[in-house]
Amino acid sequence: LWDSYMNSLTWEELVKLFTDGDGGKDGPVQFGGTCWQSTPIAAATWNIELLEEQGKMYGNQALLVGLFSWRGPGTNIHRSPFNGRTFEYYSEDPFLTASMAAVIVDGCQSKGVSCFAKHMFANVQEYNRADYGGVCTFATEQVFREIYQRSFEWMVKYGHTNGMMTSFNRVGYVVNSNNWAVHEELLRNEWGFTGATVDDAWAKDFVSCDLMLRAGDDTLMGSDTAHKCYVTVGQWDASLRDGKGDVLCPTEDGDDTFESTTHYYAMRKSAQRIQQAKVNSNQYKNFASDFELTATVSYGLANAAQIACAETTDFNVT
């Protein structure tokens, strides 16, 4: 069934799925949104039952406004108070971070919201993180596994996350978004992840979209560069491969083109994972998309989020 569906998509449609990872509601300080406690405050409760309920509340609100994915939670480690996004991450303790992250993801995804947990992994500073080539992070394998990867592993194994957001830093000298070992060997083959991935927002020139696609990072979440690569400049030629069609990519100097079957395969594989993540979310509502979900919600500073959108909320389906 999936083969038949993917065969029906044009090259342009496959490219759009890869390059169209941005959009939707935005930001922790968005006007008109719901204000929640900061993530370290949540971790300070040590209350996984409470965090699971909060995840369900996130999911309920997403259902009401028509969202099927959440670019979160952020689960990097508080390596330093000067991290830059410490307010967005749970703790300096990997066990506490992993425990909180797994249950809030599990709660949110119980409502059909795909959680693109971020930023996998070792994203420990913001300065030089993206604009100047990606900071190089070095550690032993034990340190990476026990501290910086644990929350992401637990969100896959116990939170059953349907998404993952990668980071712009480098592991050693290799850009995380372009790292085959991170995406295919660790995330999918070892941890058993079956969802889709997205890179961090606004990729710079050092993030090769071509290598990103081939490494198994499925979606580009916006870019303010030309990202000159086969992804956007490759052209479909229906006459190739005995009439089955294939992609013509430009040579390095741009004066000629060559046939690249491997590039088509990588693009198709990522596009299929993106589509599978969508149909496993609430976007299609089990293909009963002609109904409308509404609820009576009170607004105002005095209104508690638990009252507004707790599990006891009465939803009206029309």
What does each of the following model-derived ranges do?
Residues 1-318:
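Glycoside hydrolase catalytic-domain context in secreted enzymes
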